From Swiss-Prot:
Protein's name in the database: Elongator complex protein 3
Gene responsible for this protein: elp3
Radical SAM core domain location: 84-374
Effects seen without this gene: Morpholino knockdown results in inhibition of neural crest cell migration and reduced expression of N-cadherin.
GO cellular component: cytoplasm; elongator holoenzyme complex; nucleus
InterPro entries reported in the protein's UniProt record: Acyl_CoA_acyltransferase (IPR016181), ELP3 (IPR039661), ELP3-like (IPR034687), ELP3-like_N (IPR056591), Elp3/MiaA/NifB-like_rSAM (IPR006638), GNAT_dom (IPR000182), Radical_SAM_C (IPR032432), rSAM (IPR007197)
Length: 549
């Protein structure tokens, strides 16, 4: 029924909006019962016009108004940005308070390309951020309070129709480990408390309650520098429940690291990778093509070196092409003509060639920074660089075989393909002084990845007492596909179908029969420890361990 003009005249905008939302839901239910596909944007536009509204109803309001009996059916279809939880986990990025970069003390300045920080043009921003990225703006709104940042983001994802049973934190905002210990403890304690609802007095208490929380913290990622990734830093991060490190590498060339004022050597990068992997961490590196004194050939050479040389070989990579932003040393070089960025098409070519080099055990998390385009004076001109690079790869006849491209959840969203014939595939390689085994369940015909496990035979130099004397460690276990609440089984989703258990059994066999290890350890997120307890593991220090004899 279309309301007549008289009726509309007597109604407030809020009442008309309520009727519009109810009408949209009614049409969605009818479409579902008739088995039809609906274009939500067209439906919203048409229904808003019918009620004489100038604005469309927000997706959050539509999701909130769905009746209980239709929630299971409609909410997954309405979900905004399904990629957010396609890998099986809701990622919550939080920022620590702004602080100066630690290497100012001995190099006299920050890196030449770094835009943010307390002394920069961008007030309230943290080091290496502008304050205008979505995460930065959420952090500033919450006045950098970790508890509020977490609660607000989890609520926001819930309202957008995402399942937030499993949360992974990313701690951003400069070198977290350079901050005072009491602030770091306060910050991590509040992250765990925001999920469990408990108010803790110490990190260990927060972690204990977080283990039993309904919303599980399945991992914490901390951004750091190679010189803040030493034994004491790694031990602290293990106590926090951290499972992954993002290490700023930027370049594998010593002269470029020196000229851009990084404040550490490339040797320090290799050492930090070695220590981190021997402690069980997953290592993600930040790399910056198009730095000063590079050039196209040298850029391609550095990525060949990065993936081929066993001293590097990270588990993941964030690719951040250099951006020129006002107030930086690089901006001065660019203004005086001493630095030139690649042209947009050259950059797309370069990224396409880099993605073709990525081995199947590495995950490319990002291909550009989240910095708003108006702040960029020179550098990336496209907001969808990964898509353009993948399209260029199609033209060149190459393909990207990194973990993210092949994930089952992402494949389903982008290409509507589902795995058919699933096999266990094993890849062995040497990295950072240790024997690495990458186990995965894949559909080799369609090249779709369902689950993966990273197993490492710890080297002799392992510094953790729990990992000394012939121990193997599982550094990652992840079954992809949309988030399934931890206690339920959904036959159409790939999480909780037993793939994780099969991967663990194979890892235990390799550790016992091939590595000759007497014990296997797992670096487990705080919220997933009970999963390992069920299969015979117990807590020893920060690790879940099991004897193999």
């Amino acid at each position: 029924m279309k309301p007549d003009r008289g009726m509309r005249g007597n109604m407030s905008q809020a009442e008309l909006m309520m009727m519009t939302v109810a009408d949209v839901i009614k049409q969605l239910v009818e479409a579902h019962e008739q088995g039809k596909d609906v274009n939500l944007n067209k439906l919203k536009t048409k229904t808003s016009a019918k009620y004489g509204l100038s604005a469309q109803p927000r997706l959050v309001d539509i999701i909130a108004a769905v009746p209980p009996q239709y929630r299971k059916i409609l909410v997954p279809k309405l979900k905004a940005k399904p990629i957010r939880t396609a890998s099986g986990i809701a990622v919550v990025a939080v920022m620590c308070k702004p602080h100066r970069c630690p290497h100012i003390n001995f190099t006299g300045n920050i890196c030449v390309y770094c835009p943010g920080g307390p002394d920069s043009d961008f007030e309230y921003s943290t080091q290496s951020y502008t304050g205008y990225e979505p995460t930065s703006m959420r952090a500033i709104r919450a006045r950098y309070d970790p508890y509020l940042q977490t609660r607000h983001r989890v609520e926001q994802l819930k309202q957008l129709g995402h399942n937030v049973d499993k949360v992974e934190f990313i701690v951003m905002g400069g070198t977290f480990m350079a901050l005072p210990e009491d602030y770091r403890d306060f910050f991590i304690r509040n992250l765990h408390d925001a999920l469990s609802g408990h108010t803790s007095n110490s990190v260990s208490e927060a972690v204990r309650y977080s283990e039993r929380s309904n919303t599980k913290c399945v991992g914490i990622t901390i951004e750091t520098r190679p010189d803040y990734c030493l034994k004491r830093h790694l031990s602290d991060m293990l106590c926090y429940g951290c499972t992954r490190l993002e290490i700023g590498v930027q370049s594998v060339y010593e002269d470029v690291a020196r000229d851009t004022n990084r404040g550490h050597t490339v040797k320090a990068v290799c050492e930090s990778f070695h220590l981190s992997k021997d402690a069980g961490f997953k290592v993600v590196s930040h790399m910056m093509p198009d730095l000063p004194n590079m050039g196209l050939e040298r850029d391609i050479e550095q990525f060949i070196e990065f993936f081929e040389n066993p001293a590097f070989r990270p588990d993941g990579m964030k690719l951040y092409p250099t951006l020129v932003i006002r107030g930086t040393g690089l901006y001065e070089l660019w203004k005086t003509g001493r630095y030139r960025s690649y042209s947009p098409s050259t950059l797309v070519d370069l990224v396409a060639r880099i993605l073709a080099l990525v081995p199947p055990w590495t995950r490319v998390y990002r291909v550009q920074r989240d910095i708003p385009m108006p702040l960029v004076s020179s550098g990336v001109e496209h907001g969808n660089l990964r898509e353009l690079a993948l399209a260029r790869m199609k033209d060149l006849g190459t393909e990207c075989r990194d973990v993210r491209t092949r994930e089952v959840g992402i494949q389903e969203i982008h290409h509507k393909v589902r795995p058919y014939q699933v096999e266990l595939i094993r890849r062995d390689y040497v990295a950072n002084g240790g024997w690495e085994t990458f186990l995965s369940y894949e559909d080799p015909e369609q090249d779709i990845l369902i689950g993966l496990l990273r197993l490492r035979k710890c080297s002799e130099e392992s510094f953790r007492p729990e990992l000394k004397g012939g121990v193997s460690i599982v550094r990652e276990l992840h079954v992809y596909g949309s988030v399934v609440p931890i206690s339920s089984r959904d036959p159409s989703k790939f999480q909780h179908q037993g793939f994780g258990m099969l991967l663990m059994e194979e890892a235990e066999r390799i550790a016992r029969d091939e590595h000759g290890s007497w014990k296997i350890a797992v670096i487990s997120g705080v919220g997933t420890r009970n999963y390992y307890r069920k299969i015979g593991y117990e807590l020893e220090g920060p690790y879940m361990v099991k004897r193999l004899d």
